[in-house]
Design a protein with these regions (language model features):
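Helix-turn-helix
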Residues: 20, 28-62, 66
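Hydrophobic alpha-helical connector segments
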Residues: 66, 80-109, 132-134, 150, ...
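Amphipathic C-terminal alpha-helical segment
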Residues: 161-179, 194-199
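Generic hydrophobic, amphipathic alpha-helix propensity
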Residues: 17-25, 42, 67-75, 79
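Amphipathic alpha-helical packing segments from all-alpha helical-bundle domains
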Residues: 79, 103, 121-147, 154-159, ...
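Amphipathic alpha-helical segments used for helix-helix packing
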Residues: 105-123, 169-177
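N-terminal intrinsically disordered/low-complexity leader segments
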Residues: 1-16, 27
Length: 199
């Protein structure tokens, strides 16, 4: 048993510690919420000294930023897969909206981190911002496919996603009572109403 942590530390010295810490943080995040993440606890999870953690993540904000970035990357992949075979415009937007909801449902605490108070207020984490833009671009392409004037696509996309996020959050918090079997249809209907509202 004692040999396992030693082997892990050896692997980490070759550059895998940041990835292992992000994985550990995401596991704790989903189990206990964002406030449960402690750099010292993550060091224990990874079997390393806490000083090794601080070399990669000077504070919890930097770790949260990378967790959020991972979340947005995963969301972007889901959105692209969901819309790959859909016609531009409403069909793509509905598919993306349902995928957005499913991602939030599957990883609610990560979704709350991604959609909560902005992590990148000071612009310290450009790769996080790039991941957000990559995901939201799927919705922008969807709106461009509706024939919307190019000059307003970005603004209307932002409004749409903000409204969709609100609907999804209300479902996750059980403020909107939606039975799980009916959730996809509910999101699709809400999406169509939101499209009309911002068009």
């Amino acid at each position: 048993m004692a040999a396992k942590p030693t082997a892990k530390r050896e692997t980490f010295r070759h550059g895998n510690l940041p990835e292992a810490l992000v994985d550990a943080a995401l596991a704790r995040l989903e189990a206990d919420g964002v406030e449960a993440i402690s750099l010292r606890d993550l060091a224990r999870d990874a079997g390393v000294n806490h000083r090794a953690v601080y070399r990669h993540f000077p504070d919890k904000l930097s770790l949260r930023a990378l967790d959020a970035e991972r979340g947005w990357q995963g969301l972007a992949l889901r959105l692209k897969n969901a819309t790959a075979s859909k016609a531009p415009g409403e069909p793509a937007l509905v598919a993306a909206s349902v995928a957005f909801f499913q991602c939030a449902r599957d990883f609610p605490n990560l979704f709350h981190l991604m959609s909560g108070a902005r992590v990148n207020v000071e612009g310290e984490f450009p790769t996080l911002e790039a991941a957000i833009i990559d995901a939201l671009q799927v919705f922008a392409v969807g709106f461009a496919g509706t024939g919307m004037a190019p000059g307003i696509v970005v603004e209307r996309t932002a409004l749409f996603v903000a409204a969709l996020q609100g609907v999804v959050t209300q479902i996750l918090h059980h403020r909107l009572k939606v039975a799980p079997p009916k959730a996809k249809a509910f999101i699709a209907d809400a999406c169509r109403m939101l499209i009309k509202g911002v068009s």
